[in-house]
Amino acid sequence: MNALFAIAALVAAAVAADKSPESPSSVPSGTWPDGKKAAFYLSFDDGCPTQTTNVFPLLEKYRIPGTFYVCPGWDLFKKYESAWSNANEYVFLGNHTMTHGKIPDKAALDRELAGCNAVIARLRPKQKGPVSFAIPAAESMHKVLEITDEEIAETYKRHNLVERWLWHGYPVQCKTIPEMEAYVDKVIESGGVGHMDFHGVGGDWLDPGLEYFEALMKKLDSRRGEIWFATHIQIYERLKNRK
């Protein structure tokens, strides 16, 4: 799969020309609820089947939410649609376009985004508010099609989307369990926003292995008292509202 650099989101209105901004490494003291030192979110791209079988139960076990960026036009997604529809309360869906395919122009982009949003609304009707969006197979919308910053902002507003922060996860960063655990500690120390982004977990493509993911969940749980576990959208909205 070519979705390795599926990217990430706006906290401000500006859109980076070549690459989406990284998540904030630090924020003012008192930003996070309940005296938490840092925020952390999990995200999963492409709607891999192993996400439904391996990730869903672990999110529920550890009470940590995750956002899954799905491509509803894929036959593979349709095959497991009931699992997505009946997923537990820790599962949130994000927009990864309908097909993860070539987008030749702005009209095609609108169709891809609107179609994906419609499926998300149908499968998860209780999920309200803006929808998190991960650009498929690129680090910027400018690398997907010819489009201006203003047109990107207008498109996101029209479809009620918030772009995810720059991809961070295996196999680009945190290639080993010790590296991943050190990253979690660093996020807490800095007081910003941490996240780990995945594709397959225990199978499928770009898979770090189920042992790796279970180690991440145990590490996050061990520092639960210091971390606000939230979705990308929840973190985005908290930062936006505290400006």
Which residue ranges define each predicted feature?
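Boundary/entry segment of secreted carbohydrate-active catalytic domains
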Residues: 20-53
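A Trp-anchored, charged/polar loop motif used as the substrate-binding/catalytic surface
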Residues: 173-185
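Active-site metal-binding loops of divalent metal-dependent hydrolases
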Residues: 44-47, 97, 200, 232
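Extracytoplasmic/secreted proteins, especially bacterial periplasmic and envelope-associated proteins
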Residues: 39, 50, 54, 108-111, ...
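C-terminal domain-boundary segment and adjacent tail
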Residues: 23-34, 66-67, 74-76, 158-166, ...
